[in-house]
């Protein structure tokens, strides 16, 4: 955690300070940025204020006086709530514009961490509380070109595992001993384990026919179906290397069990594929012109394409999400649907592009790639691109 770099950005953005607040390790974003461990007791509130200029300030409870000792700055203590309020007045001083892990109107839920009561308390002291979303994007969500190597390494193994899953399904089809959705899900998890990967206990999505019309369907022993000839198949799988700091890789592919997929299914796949292509081309064009581009703008391109093809009502989620140490990261999402993500896509941003079409009770189609913006401001796809349906027979 580099206080000086944070202060430089605060000055650039015209913000008086960044106030970190936590209780019971609720703010995982703040803990990561500050380099704090979640180990040990965390039963009392603490505050850490980084002003745009000057020395940082720590405010901790006397029951846990060493909670922020790894951080630079002057330390203040409190015990009761009245003293807490007085210390906050003293520490923060005259009314200021202060960033916190807060999102107006809960616009970006990933950032909406500080409780409403604490916001009320600080506003009552005369301060303007603004969102730290742009700061989080810069100091938590961007991935340097050393760390991104773990993403590429995981990607090769995940791609390999997907091919193995398709082959496992093919064996079942040819033998007449059909594999179930759940069996393929468990096969993927076992292969992840064997390869030193983890999905953080979130199982992959494996669904046939109408099952993936629920975009986040995942099979269980109770709801699982056999994967048989003429089935339409969707597999969404994600994993990272099982080591600290590793970055996720997350893809979705579609397949047909047979050699002659229905025309409607082919057409729907081509629509989502081309929406994905259009979104990437727009992003690359903007970056090539050295223009800024926000997550919501890229979503608009993919969404408009699907709407023009007549399936806008069936595209029921954002076009993509930030990726980091968690499969859903804390950076800019490709979203002007579930939220309007105004954050800029910057060098170091890693995210998915995954437009989809979901017809309830019938089928679901999605095509997902991961995109990284490197230090040269080039947007690159980090793995394979699916161009046609995989045919399994």
Task: Label every PLM stretch briefly.
Residues 1-393:
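Active-site neighborhoods and metal-handling regions in enzymes and metal-associated proteins
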């Amino acid at each position: 955690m580099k206080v000086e770099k944070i202060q430089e950005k605060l000055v650039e953005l015209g913000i008086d300070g960044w106030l970190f607040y936590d209780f019971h390790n609720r703010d995982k974003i703040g803990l990561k940025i500050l380099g704090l461990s979640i180990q040990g007791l965390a039963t009392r509130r603490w505050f850490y204020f980084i002003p745009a200029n000057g020395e940082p300030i720590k405010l901790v409870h006397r029951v846990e006086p060493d909670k922020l000792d790894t951080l630079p700055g002057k330390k203040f203590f409190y015990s009761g709530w009245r003293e807490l309020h007085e210390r906050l007045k003293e520490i923060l001083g005259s009314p200021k514009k202060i960033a916190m892990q807060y999102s107006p109107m809960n616009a970006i839920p990933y950032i909406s961490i500080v409780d409403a009561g604490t916001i009320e308390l600080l506003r009552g002291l005369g301060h303007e509380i603004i969102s730290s979303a742009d700061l989080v994007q810069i100091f938590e969500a961007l991935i340097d070109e050393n760390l991104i190597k773990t993403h590429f390494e995981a990607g090769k193994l995940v791609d390999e595992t997907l091919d193995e899953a398709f082959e496992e399904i093919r064996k079942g089809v040819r033998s007449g001993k059909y594999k179930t959705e759940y069996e393929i899900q468990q096969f993927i998890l076992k292969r992840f384990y064997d390869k030193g990967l983890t999905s953080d206990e979130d199982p992959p999505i494996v669904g046939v026919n109408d099952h993936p019309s629920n975009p986040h369907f995942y099979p269980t022993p109770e709801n699982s179906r056999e994967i048989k000839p003429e089935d339409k198949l969707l597999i969404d799988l994600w994993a990272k290397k099982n080591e600290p700091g590793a970055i996720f890789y997350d893809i979705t592919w579609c397949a047909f069990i047979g050699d002659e997929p229905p025309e409607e299914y082919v057409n729907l796949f081509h629509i989502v594929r081309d929406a994905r292509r259009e979104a990437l081309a727009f992003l690359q064009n903007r970056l090539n012109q050295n223009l800024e581009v926000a997550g919501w703008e890229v979503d608009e391109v993919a969404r408009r394409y699907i709407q023009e093809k007549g399936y806008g009502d069936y595209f029921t989620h954002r076009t993509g999400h930030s990726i980091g140490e968690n499969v859903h990261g804390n950076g800019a999402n490709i979203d002007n649907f579930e939220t309007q993500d105004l954050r800029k896509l910057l060098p170091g941003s890693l995210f998915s592009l995954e437009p989809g079409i979901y017809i309830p009770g019938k089928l679901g189609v999605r095509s997902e790639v991961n995109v990284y913006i490197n230090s040269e401001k080039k947007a690159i796809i980090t793995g394979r691109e699916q161009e046609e349906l995989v045919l399994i027979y």
